[in-house]
Amino acid sequence: MAEIYDFDKSAWDVKGSIQPIGPKTYSDGRLIPQVRVIDPGLGVRKDECFSYIFLWGLSEDSDPLSPPIGRTFGSLPLGVGRSTARPEELLKEATILDILVRRTAGFNEQLVFYDNSPLKVLTPWKKVLTSGSVFNANQVCETVNLIPLDFYQRFRVVYMSITRLSDNGGYDIPRHWPEFRSMNAIAFNSLVTIRFEQSPIEHWRILNSEHLLVATFMVHIGNFQRKKTDMYSADYCKPKIEKMGLVFALGGIGGTSLHIRATGKMSKTLWALEGFKKHLCYPLMDINEDLNRELWRSKCKIVRIQAVLQPSVPQDFRVYRDVIIEDDQGLFKIL
């Protein structure tokens, strides 16, 4: 069973919310492009601030002889770049990009993006734009089945989200070590509860005791393990977590992201496991892509964070990445 306790509200009170990008339209009904700037950090980086850009827009038929037909909303993560240009200048150039979109398939359904226009202020982000990029369609597209194959598709940028990376040092994106399992270890996870201002899709409609629309997601932070054969108790781990002085914030990496900063003392084992860094970033694009799509331009706010202490999954438990369960008969073969 899990032991759960609440973090104090001060752990996320400063930067635990993201403002919405409210829809504004021209007289003909077209959406007016807008930009949003998020800074989940401390603002202590001495050199020019690095920025992560995330584009949100519409995939539409690219036919010069007729008005464009919008198919579905989608996104294009541009990644990190350095620039002194103002957000409005970056948005202006993004709206005139000639980004082509193509639907294809690999291990899963994918979208291919390629920009044909010359770049100026967006040159620091040219790797994704001019070299071409391929993304998991479910992560960057609202409804991929609506994208046709018999029409050229153009990605028209409507909104831009800029995340300022203003902390000193780098950020760890946990990908492999959350799968680390060990005997007699206690897994330290965090359960994050967020509140929406805009209504998400139906299956996220969960009301808390105050009748507010909420959703939850969980991230793995690390393991507490003793050298001896016996296991730490949850009561022993709790003060260790409190000494870490964890501070939480919301950013816009990959759409919406959870940023965790350790301001206090961290155990040597846990610190080494996290690459000797005290800045962690969890993009919801990797953790919960369905929820992430609902938060692309919505206002959301952290309302509760809980520390969840659970026994680590035993090492002899196998992790299955797909529905093809290996069998002794050899009827299925993974290519």
Curated annotation (Swiss-Prot):
It is found in: Virion. The keyword Acetylation does not apply. Keywords: Viral envelope protein, Viral matrix protein, Virion. GO terms for molecular function: structural constituent of virion. Its main location: virion. Belongs to the morbillivirus/respirovirus/rubulavirus M protein family. The M protein has a crucial role in virus assembly and interacts with the RNP complex as well as with the viral membrane. This is Matrix protein. It comes from Rinderpest virus (strain Kabete O). The gene is M.
